[in-house]
């Protein structure tokens, strides 16, 4: 549930996300505005996984790659400002994180190509092309007006890839123990 006044103020779900990660973006934006996002553990949610698109769909893969880039572009610099970084530094910091994320996506695309999954390879390339056309970069002045918030709960500040591959950590247990709550 969300307060209708907040829903209207933040313009609800961002329509650019279609079918994947739009609720994550909304919750992230709520936190950037200084609100808490909570859950009720006793609640039950019925969700048909793969109800929109089958798990093996190249379109689903494209949406996942594209929308995760949009999520970072929309919220990462603002998050760094909320944590106390100066706006220009926050933009550079976000750019670095997103650059490395794109490099890792390129590695994924290469693996798909080398393993004969040309449809997945194309999906990753299309995701990046579409993300570029959908992104509206935050400007320094807007970031400067934002101010600090108490932080973003549930954000992991490290690399899950390094934690998993290089340190041999079980990813979700490790992340849960390191998350900023």
Question: What are these language model-derived features?
Answer:
Residues 1-2, 24, 104, 108-112, ...:
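Catalytic-site signature of metal-activated, phosphate-bearing donor transferases
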Residues 1-44:
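A short, conserved alpha-helix in the catalytic core of glycosyltransferases
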Residues 25, 86-87, 142, 146:
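Residue-level signal for alpha-helical context at structural boundaries
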């Amino acid at each position: 549930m969300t307060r209708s006044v907040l829903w209207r103020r933040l313009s609800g779900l961002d329509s650019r996300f279609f079918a994947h990660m739009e609720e994550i973006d909304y919750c992230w934006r709520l936190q950037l505005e200084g609100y808490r996002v909570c859950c009720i553990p006793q609640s039950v949610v019925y969700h048909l996984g793969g109800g929109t698109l089958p798990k093996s769909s190249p379109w689903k893969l494209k949406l996942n790659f594209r929308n995760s880039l949009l999520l970072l572009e929309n919220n990462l610099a603002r998050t760094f400002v909320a944590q106390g970084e100066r706006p220009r530094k926050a933009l550079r910091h976000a750019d670095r994180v997103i650059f490395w994320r794109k490099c890792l996506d390129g590695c994924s695309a290469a693996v798909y190509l080398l393993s004969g999954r040309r449809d997945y390879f194309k999906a990753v390339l299309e995701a990046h092309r579409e993300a570029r056309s959908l992104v509206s970069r935050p400007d320094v002045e807007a970031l400067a007006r934002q101010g600090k918030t108490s932080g973003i709960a549930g954000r992991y500040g490290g690399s899950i890839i390094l934690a998993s591959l290089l340190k041999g950590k079980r990813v979700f247990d490790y992340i849960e123990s390191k998350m900023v709550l």
